[in-house]
């Protein structure tokens, strides 16, 4: 396993320069507490969780503010993460992946997200793209595309959303018309994470008639004539990853780059998104966990009216509620991850529930943490505001939380 060469580190996050504290673990301030994210894990899971926490502390947390403020895409750091197996966490080992489970993946992304939620979210999307190729591609495609994705020598972006089709993804209009041994793509995709920087674009496009059965999945490689990108979007958060439109103008792509059969694209998209919802919910857990620790430490240090804020019962109760909601969200996410791994019939509904609950609750936790920091929480010298901004979009992407409610109710009503 790729973890064999890793040092055995304790699960802790350090301090950012300039007082930008993320998570401190010394003595009684350890994760051995009621919010300990290692509870219920086996020894192997605890070990790679420690590796992920340490990587977040050393490589991500000290840089997350700079990446955010300068809008830097941390290629070198992500490639270091890939050396630990994080570039292809749930990709099969024969093409360079770590071959871990969905639960293992959730544990890792939660830990990494404490160091930089935005960067971890991109890594999770990259993993989802690699999984689609690994799971639905033929052997030639798997061995061509997956190894450089697992090492993050190459980066991947997922192209589903269009200017006119967001939640109604099955109505997408980007066309792929077959001409000989190529498809000619025309159309555009919107809000694509990594666009312009990524090397591999997993594109859902229309090869047939209207509706989901007319959609196919095609890999478009950077540098293909007819592939271009829009301007870099200015965003509230997720600033360590670029977001652009992806544009196809008579873009000729080999038929050999089609993943799966014609008309299978929507199934691939949906299957990928089930896992993507677990991944993004796990990123929310990491942001919320870091925010709870930040708030706990602030309440112990900050004094008003001659007493530490921690002595105020209202603030005690609020902190208790934050911790309780964090643990509840984590349990939901991990339960859904196991259901997805086991391919249970209720997996789609459970993934939707976990994504809905975790992203809503964890954003609320981060936002409450900012409030409890008072004016300091609104300053960019303090990390809590970045967790708020980076976790807000999780309620929108990988299927908005309104769509999650549709999927959950549909599952209940069709029983």
From Swiss-Prot:
It catalyses: 2-methylpropanoyl-CoA + oxidized [electron-transfer flavoprotein] + H(+) = 2-methylpropenoyl-CoA + reduced [electron-transfer flavoprotein]; (2S)-2-methylbutanoyl-CoA + oxidized [electron-transfer flavoprotein] + H(+) = (2E)-2-methylbut-2-enoyl-CoA + reduced [electron-transfer flavoprotein]; propanoyl-CoA + oxidized [electron-transfer flavoprotein] + H(+) = acryloyl-CoA + reduced [electron-transfer flavoprotein]. FAD binds at residues 158-167, 191-193, 302, 312-313, 371-375, 400-402. Belongs to the acyl-CoA dehydrogenase family. One of its GO terms (cellular component) is mitochondrial matrix. This is Isobutyryl-CoA dehydrogenase, mitochondrial. One of its GO terms (biological process) is valine catabolic process. GO terms for molecular function: acyl-CoA dehydrogenase activity; flavin adenine dinucleotide binding; short-chain 2-methyl fatty acyl-CoA dehydrogenase activity. Residues 1-22 form a transit peptide. The modification N6-acetyllysine is found at residues 50, 231. It is found in: Mitochondrion. Its cofactor is FAD. Keywords: Acetylation, Activator, Branched-chain amino acid catabolism, Disease variant, FAD, Flavoprotein, Mitochondrion, Oxidoreductase, Transcription, Transcription regulation, Transit peptide. The keyword Repressor does not apply. Substrate binds at residues 167, 274-277, 410. The modification N6-succinyllysine is found at residues 50, 213. Pathway: Amino-acid degradation; L-valine degradation. Detected at comparable levels in heart, lung, brain, skeletal muscle, pancreas and placenta. Weakly expressed in liver and kidney. It comes from Homo sapiens. Its EC number is 1.3.8.5. It comes from the Eukaryota. Homotetramer, formed by a dimer of dimers. May be part of the large multiprotein complex ARC/DRIP.
């Amino acid at each position: 396993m790729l973890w064999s060469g890793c040092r055995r580190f304790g699960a802790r996050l350090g301090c950012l320069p300039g007082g930008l504290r993320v998570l401190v673990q010394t003595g009684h301030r350890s994760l051995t507490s009621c919010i300990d994210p290692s509870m219920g894990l086996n020894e192997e899971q605890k070990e790679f969780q420690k590796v992920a926490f340490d990587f977040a502390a050393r490589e991500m947390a000290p840089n997350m503010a700079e990446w955010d403020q300068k809008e830097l895409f941390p290629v070198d750091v992500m490639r270091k993460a890939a050396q630990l197996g994080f570039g292809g966490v749930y990709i099969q080992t024969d093409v360079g992946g770590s071959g871990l489970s969905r639960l293992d993946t959730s544990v890792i992304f939660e830990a990494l997200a404490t160091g930089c939620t935005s960067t971890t979210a991109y890594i999770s999307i990259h993993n989802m793209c690699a999984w689609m190729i690994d799971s639905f591609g033929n052997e030639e495609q798997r061995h061509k595309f997956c190894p450089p994705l697992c090492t993050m020598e190459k980066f991947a972006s997922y192209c589903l959303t269009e200017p006119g089709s967001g939640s109604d993804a099955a109505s997408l209009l980007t066309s792929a018309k077959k001409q000989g041994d190529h498809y000619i793509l025309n159309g555009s995709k919107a809000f694509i994470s990594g666009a312009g920087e990524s090397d591999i674009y997993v594109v859902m496009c229309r090869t047939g008639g209207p509706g989901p059965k007319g959609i196919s999945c095609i890999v478009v490689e950077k540098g293909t004539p007819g592939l271009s990108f829009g301007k870099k979007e200015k965003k509230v958060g997720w600033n360590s990853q670029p977001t652009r439109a992806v544009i196809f103008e008579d873009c000729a792509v080999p038929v050999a780059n089609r993943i799966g059969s014609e008309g299978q694209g929507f199934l691939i998209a949906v299957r990928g998104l089930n896992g993507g919802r677990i991944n993004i919910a796990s990123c929310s857990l990491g942001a919320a966990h870091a925010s709870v620790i930040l708030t706990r430490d602030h309440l112990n240090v900050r004094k008003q009216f001659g007493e530490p804020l921690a002595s105020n019962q209202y603030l005690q109760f609020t902190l208790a509620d934050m911790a309780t909601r964090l643990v509840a969200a984590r349990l939901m996410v991990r339960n859904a991850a196991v259901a997805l791994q086991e391919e249970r019939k209720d997996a789609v509904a459970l993934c939707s529930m976990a994504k809905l609950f975790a992203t809503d609750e964890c954003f609320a936790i981060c936002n409450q943490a900012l409030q409890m920091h008072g004016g300091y929480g609104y300053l960019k010298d303090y990390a809590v505001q970045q967790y708020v901004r980076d976790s807000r979009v999780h309620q929108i992407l990988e299927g908005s939380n309104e769509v999650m409610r549709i999927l959950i109710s549909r599952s209940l009503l069709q029983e």
